[in-house]
Amino acid sequence: TTDPDFDEWLKNVEDATGLNINVIAAPTDSDTRQQKVTTVLSTGDASIDIIEINDEMSASFKNSGWLEGLNDTVMTEDVRSQFAQGYLKNMITDKDGNIVGVPGYTGYLAFWVNQKIMDEVGITEINTKEDFMKYMEAASGDGRYGYGGSWEKTYAYNEIAQFVNMFGGDYFDWTKAENKEAIQFMKDMVDNNQTPIDQIADKYEQMNPKINDGKYGSFFMWGLGTDYEKAGMLGDDKIHMAMVPDFSGKGERAIVTDSRNYVLNSASKNKEAAIKF
């Protein structure tokens, strides 16, 4: 709802469906949003028919019985075949085989660099762990850091998972040595003043202004850089996406993905209209 084109999008949907759609903006704070949606669904609140949920909510809610199965109405076989089958099975199919979500968005946690800083310190590529470490050392100092992040408690897992993947670990198996190596690497960046410890309080709202101010030489971020574009900082000679480095040395590169799904509240009194939407 914060997108400047949202009102136009909503009008197009209403014109196409003939529906009168009342929109309630979700809380922007992730904890508050999770609590609100959980309360609505768990109490059988029928005031909201369709909710757009993220991956965390999908994992929490898919076996709760709070969401309507959509196999025979929206997510029919011809529609299901258009999506990655592993994603459908793992993220939006409940224990009884009911598909409870309609994918509406997917994105990825891309690696970004500040090209001005790279040029300044003479780093031409960040392809390996060794390249990354050289950049950290060269770019850090005088209030600037080679790497920046958003490590607030509800955000930190994104980058933890990303570094674990880059080292060839498994976020779901903490017996693996690669996982511990990744966490040690992140701690070493803090100890070496290559990334700031105070970012444990930062969400993206706090991180992005620092990026635009040239405080960070590299970082991971979702989306296409809208905040950087608005600040005049997006471009091949400024802030831009780059290939994620191969830390494992095995030629493997990995990124974290995310998604949003439309779900139908099983308590809804307007299921026919919701399915039309």
Predicted regions and their residues:
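Conserved N-terminal structural module of periplasmic/extracytoplasmic solute-binding proteins
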Residues: 1-66, 76-81, 125, 233, ...
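Extracytoplasmic/periplasmic substrate-recognition and gating elements
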Residues: 16, 25, 120, 192-194, ...
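Loop/turn elements at helix/coil->beta-strand transitions in domains of secreted/extracellular proteins
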Residues: 17-21, 44-49, 98, 140-145, ...
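Short helices/loops that flank or line small-molecule/ion binding pockets
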Residues: 34-46, 64, 117-118, 134-138, ...
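Beta->alpha turn/N-cap motifs
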Residues: 53-57, 204, 220-226, 259-260
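Hinge/lid segment of periplasmic solute-binding proteins
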Residues: 55-109, 133, 159, 236-244
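Short glycine- and hydrophobic/aromatic-rich loop-to-beta-strand nucleating segment
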Residues: 109-113, 262-264
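Glycine-centered hinge/linker elements that transmit conformational signals in sensory
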Residues: 133-140, 172-200, 244
